[in-house]
């Protein structure tokens, strides 16, 4: 079973759009253990501690449907999974090179703030799938 206390989102910058912040807060109420940190820069050494999994979001990454994403996250067993979202310039190639996976949410390009909301919804959906919750309908 996938649990939100094993998942964290680290993003560069703050959410400025109120409607996106409201959407994120709705999912945070459903997953209070999910860590969401707004940073100025990524410190890969801290995020890598204890063999944590690093997943960078980037439009050139690998795409999964929701069920596949759930399976992928479940395969990481009891490791902590850190999702990294860059700012308007994305994530540096150095950080991408040192990540375990580069994930694309879609072939479309999204503003980084909207990507956070989409990722949080997909995390909630993956947890729901792993718990056989009726939220996900395939």
Curated annotation (Swiss-Prot):
Its EC number is 2.1.1.177. Disulfide bonds: none annotated. It holds the Pfam family SPOUT_MTase. It catalyses: pseudouridine(1915) in 23S rRNA + S-adenosyl-L-methionine = N(3)-methylpseudouridine(1915) in 23S rRNA + S-adenosyl-L-homocysteine + H(+). The keyword S-adenosyl-L-methionine applies. Specifically methylates the pseudouridine at position 1915 (m3Psi1915) in 23S rRNA. One of its GO terms (cellular component) is cytoplasm. HAMAP family: 23SrRNA_methyltr_H (MF_00658). This is Ribosomal RNA large subunit methyltransferase H. Homodimer. Keywords: Cytoplasm, Methyltransferase, rRNA processing, S-adenosyl-L-methionine, Transferase.
